[in-house]
Amino acid sequence: MKSCGSLLTPLYRLPSPLGPLLLAGRGGWLSGLWFEGERHCPMSHQAEARSQCLALEWDGAHAAVADLPPFVETTLQWLRAYFSGLLPLPPLPDLNLRGTPFQLAVWRELLDVPFATTLSYGALALRVAHRLQRPSVGVRAVAGAVGRNPVSILVPCHRIVGARGALGGYAGGVERKVALLAHEGKCADGRDVASSDWFFGCPPQ
């Protein structure tokens, strides 16, 4: 993961089982992945600009009509495996994230939270403090950085929960957080992942 020269303007729009996703990046580097309408997405409230994004197909049919950069293909491969419950997941695309040193430290720690597990904001704060070689960091500051994670799902901020298992917030909507955690639990248990399980309806066509 690197942290310079990020391209944060979404260029692609992809249907998913939990609603449309917006992708940003350049070359082999993914710099942004947001649910449409998500807080902190650079274009969440600019319908005209969003309409200019290149529409992608979930099944890869777009490949015949578009010369896509590598980050798009690797991101799609990962997302299709994730939502299909195909474990182990393929490698993540290379990430090029833009944020403060503190935010980057938080996002790096998010990458270490395993699939189908959760971690409290307080426990995450301890890990961030260790990474930054500080005695402590504020839990609220950590929560703020989690909320501004620019790569949903792949950088798994949905696995961070409140004290005593309370869900806490999620920039993409708490309903999606519930759905993602439930999905990962079923995959880890070896249960079949059916399209009807998805909170937001049918899988992408």
PLM regions: where:
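Charged low-complexity interaction tracts in eukaryotic proteins
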Residues: 152-169
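Short, positively charged loop/turn segments that connect secondary-structure elements
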Residues: 129-144
